[in-house]
């Protein structure tokens, strides 16, 4: 069975011409939502619906405005609010050393000084840097900015991330 990875969520419609607003959950939003990109649509219960080919896409604030081929009116896309767009594993490109996909990071164990502190549960994109959410037992989630002084090493094969928690991050 083919594997798919989430690249965004359709959060609303845009205008009357069948465009949708997609909240991206990928570092490669410009590539994923560019003309010709093929994505898969899944409903809110993670059931595959159909493949979609991007006709156009443009960033707007914190989301992308995307038009898919074959959808010409708001009525064609309104039912897809809350649906997920994913990319097939076979359509992912190989990355350079030191680069990784979100799905390779989420679920990784996080260590500081070889002591397990939690697991990465989510990656946020609030602005200049991604923020990795670390779920910890008995403590509130830890938010770590993806910057060199904090994220020391990422081993996607071992699902391990080594960090140095700077003063003020764990108050």
Curated annotation (Swiss-Prot):
Taxonomic superkingdom: Bacteria
Subcellular localization(s) per the UniProt record: Cytoplasm
Keywords from the UniProt entry: Chaperone, Cytoplasm, Ribosome biogenesis, rRNA processing
Residue span(s) of domain PRC barrel: 97-169
Keyword Cytoplasm part of the UniProt annotation: yes
GO CC, one annotated term: ribosome
Function, in words: An accessory protein needed during the final step in the assembly of 30S ribosomal subunit, possibly for assembly of the head region. Essential for efficient processing of 16S rRNA. May be needed both before and after RbfA during the maturation of 16S rRNA. It has affinity for free ribosomal 30S subunits but not for 70S ribosomes.
Domain comment, as recorded: The PRC barrel domain binds ribosomal protein uS19.
Subunit composition and interactions: Binds ribosomal protein uS19.
Name the record gives this protein: Ribosome maturation factor RimM
The organism of origin for this protein: Lactococcus lactis subsp. lactis (strain IL1403)
